[in-house]
């Protein structure tokens, strides 16, 4: 006979202080091992257990939920619908009223947590706060010998949800089968009168619950340290946030740096692209140059071979060139000797006669009869019958006769061999003699349209010097200009009044020089022409009966030529004296008596010197006048002399023309000693330098 326990609704609730924490784990542990057919019950979140004391059985029974569902065992089948409070008659008394394994709680809405999230170490206690969303499952019935079912705390499992959001219900058709299966597997119930077995069962449950309670107490102790851990966690969070801000600022800096580096990388990339393009171009150029280098290398090999051949040929040609230079030098020396031999055969003193043509303003003047038999003979006859019968036929022979139609170039062509002798180291003297207005200055100087002997000599000298430079000769030209006016010497290159005298050279009795004279080293033809123009402007001239601008002094231009051959250590010294004599004039017709007397006296002394040389007298009166003293080396010394005799073609000049022609004929018949070449070799170089440095030296 089954005994029935008092109805749970009749039990009173305990009046003890209630804690705010629900020990759901205790219930969950007791209900966790229920069978598949075990039910669940709804747990009110406000229901709690007392402190550390376990409630008695009656209190446990009084704390049962108001809504219970009885699952039958054996042949009893449980109703699929939950029981309601109003149907108390339907509640069947179980075999063990204390068996709470058959209890199943209803779901409730979980309250929102009031605390922030907690660390993972207390996550296992989270079920206490979210128990409303879980369901209690009855553990499987134990199979003890006494067939006493041990009540265990319920185990929380996630509550299944139906499609409509409510708990899923079993279909009605399967309820009987499930009840029959559960009845077959259900444990044997304790008899209501077996208080000992029930006591042992409750004692065993008490031990289990006590163990779980102790465990929950430990867990609660751990939960008490959670606020401190939370504060520490919040501090760590603040530190982490500060570190995060710093990291973010660092990240921003790094991002800016990344942008800068990205820009740099882009720039470098573009530069790299251009560099690659340039590299490709340079590689193409390199390949081209390499190809050219290979071709040039081959060419270099051939050129080296060719160079070696040319070097050998050059050595041979150099030896031949030295031989040719020596032969050329010797040939040049032979040419000089032969040239001057021919000049000596022609005579050391030569006379050229020139008859000037009448000017346009002189067409009304009567001319004498001039007959040219050949190039060296001229016949002069007067148109006056009385003079013609008295003087008879006048025939004169000279080295060369120039008729009025002869040009300046024709005359200089006969003079140029003497200029060549001066370059070879000989002393040359060229002077013009004749009456006033006979054309002496025109022959020596000329006019800009038709230059005379002196300007042409300058051009020939510098042209010849350039040619001699190829033969190894270097020449230096020194020039002096002076005039003899009224037997006084004047320097035409200086406006100062100087005391100038003609003196004998110490090392050579045949040489003379003029003291205190200005000597200029000529660098080019223009420089020499400038000096000649200065001298011409300083020369004394005056208007006479025979010439509007007559030279009233004897002008002497001296050019000293010093040639040096460095290889042969040879020095050649030559000189050219170009003399423009003043015109002779009858004192009776002259208005300048003193000038005329001095001019005629110097010309008369020149005639006496020529006659003394012609008669080979022991004493030659060179010192009787400044002119003859200055021309002493040219007349009787080491010199080649050329005299121009200039005559006028007019009848009124017939007497003076005859006198001039006779004087020239007497000069042409003179025999002078052979001129010697001024040549210095080796040790004589120093001596020649000393001689050439004598101030204004004439005719070395």
From Swiss-Prot:
PROSITE patterns: KINESIN_MOTOR_1, KINESIN_MOTOR_2. One of its GO terms (cellular component) is spindle. GO terms for biological process: cell division; chromosome segregation; distributive segregation; meiotic spindle assembly; meiotic spindle organization; microtubule bundle formation; minus-end directed microtubule sliding; mitotic centrosome separation. InterPro entries: Kinesin-like_fam (IPR027640), Kinesin_motor_CS (IPR019821), Kinesin_motor_dom (IPR001752), Kinesin_motor_dom_sf (IPR036961), P-loop_NTPase (IPR027417). It is found in: Cytoplasm, Cytoskeleton. It holds the Pfam family Kinesin. It catalyses: ATP + H2O = ADP + phosphate + H(+). Its main location: cytoplasm. Belongs to the TRAFAC class myosin-kinesin ATPase superfamily. Kinesin family. NCD subfamily. This is Protein claret segregational. It comes from Drosophila melanogaster.
């Amino acid at each position: 006979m089954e005994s029935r326990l008092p109805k749970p609704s009749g039990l009173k609730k305990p009046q003890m202080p209630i804690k705010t924490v629900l020990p759901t784990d205790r219930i969950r542990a007791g209900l966790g091992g229920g069978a598949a057919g075990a039910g669940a019950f709804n747990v009110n979140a406000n229901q709690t257990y007392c402190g550390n004391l376990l409630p008695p059985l009656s209190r446990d029974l009084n704390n049962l939920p108001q809504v219970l569902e009885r699952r039958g065992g054996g042949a009893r089948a449980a109703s699929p619908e939950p029981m309601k409070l109003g149907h108390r008659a339907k509640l069947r008394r179980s075999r063990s009223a204390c068996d709470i394994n058959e209890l199943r709680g209803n779901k409730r809405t979980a309250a929102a947590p009031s605390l922030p999230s907690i660390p993972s170490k207390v996550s296992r206690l989270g079920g206490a706060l979210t128990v409303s969303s879980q369901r209690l499952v009855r553990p499987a019935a134990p199979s003890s010998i006494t067939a006493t079912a041990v009540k265990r705390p319920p185990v929380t499992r996630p509550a299944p949800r139906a499609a409509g959001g409510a708990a899923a219900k079993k279909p009605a058709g399967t309820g009987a089968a499930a009840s029959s299966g559960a009845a077959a597997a259900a444990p044997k119930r304790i008899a209501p009168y077996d208080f000992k077995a029930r006591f042992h069962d409750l004692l065993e449950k008490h031990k289990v619950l006590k163990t779980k309670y102790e465990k929950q107490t430990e867990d609660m102790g751990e939960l008490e340290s959670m606020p401190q851990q939370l504060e520490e966690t919040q501090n760590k969070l603040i530190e982490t946030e500060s570190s995060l801000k710093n990291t973010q600022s660092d990240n921003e800096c790094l991002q800016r740096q990344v942008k800068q580096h990205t820009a740099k990388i882009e720039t470098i990339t573009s530069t790299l692209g251009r560099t690659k393009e340039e590299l490709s171009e340079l590689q193409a150029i390199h390949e081209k140059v390499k190809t050219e280098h290979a071709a040039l290398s081959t060419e270099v090999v051939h050129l080296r071979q060719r160079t070696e051949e040319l070097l050998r040929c050059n050595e041979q040609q150099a030896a031949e060139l030295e031989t040719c230079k020596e032969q050329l030098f010797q040939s040049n020396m032979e040419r000089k000797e032969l040239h001057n031999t021919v000049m000596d055969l022609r005579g050391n003193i030569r006379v050229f006669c020139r008859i000037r043509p009448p000017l346009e303003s002189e067409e009304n003047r009567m001319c004498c009869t001039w007959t040219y038999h050949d190039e060296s003979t001229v016949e002069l006859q007067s148109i006056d019958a009385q003079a013609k019968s008295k003087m008879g036929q006048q025939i004169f022979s000279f080295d060369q006769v120039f008729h009025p139609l002869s040009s300046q170039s024709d005359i200089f062509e006969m003079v140029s061999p003497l200029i060549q002798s001066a370059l070879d180291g000989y002393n040359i003297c060229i002077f013009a003699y004749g009456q006033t207005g006979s054309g002496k200055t025109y022959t020596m100087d000329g006019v800009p349209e038709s230059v005379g002997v002196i300007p042409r000599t300058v051009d020939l000298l510098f042209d010849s010097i350039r040619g001699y430079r190829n033969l190894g000769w270097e020449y230096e030209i020194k020039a002096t200009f002076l005039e003899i006016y009224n037997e006084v010497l004047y320097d035409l290159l200086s406006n100062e009044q100087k005391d100038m005298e003609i003196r004998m050279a110490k090392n050579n009795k045949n040489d003379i020089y003029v003291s205190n004279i200005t000597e200029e080293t000529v660098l080019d033809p223009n420089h020499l022409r400038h000096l000649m123009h200065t001298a011409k402007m300083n020369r004394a001239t005056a208007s006479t009966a025979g010439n509007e601008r007559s030279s009233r002094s004897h002008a002497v231009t001296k050019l000293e030529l010093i040639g040096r051959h460095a290889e042969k250590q040879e020095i050649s010294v030559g000189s050219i004296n170009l003399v423009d004599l003043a015109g002779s004039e009858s004192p009776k017709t002259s208005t300048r008596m003193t000038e005329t007397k001095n001019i005629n006296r110097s010309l008369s002394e020149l005639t006496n010197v020529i006659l003394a040389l012609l008669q080979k007298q022991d004493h030659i009166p060179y010192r009787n006048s400044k002119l003859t003293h200055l021309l002493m080396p040219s007349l009787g010394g080491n010199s080649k002399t050329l005299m121009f005799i200039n005559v006028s073609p007019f009848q009124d000049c017939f007497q003076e023309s005859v006198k001039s022609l006779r004087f020239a004929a007497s000069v042409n018949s003179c025999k002078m000693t052979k001129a010697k070449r001024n040549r210095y070799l080796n040790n004589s170089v120093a001596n020649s330098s000393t001689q050439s440095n004598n101030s204004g030296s004439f005719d070395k």
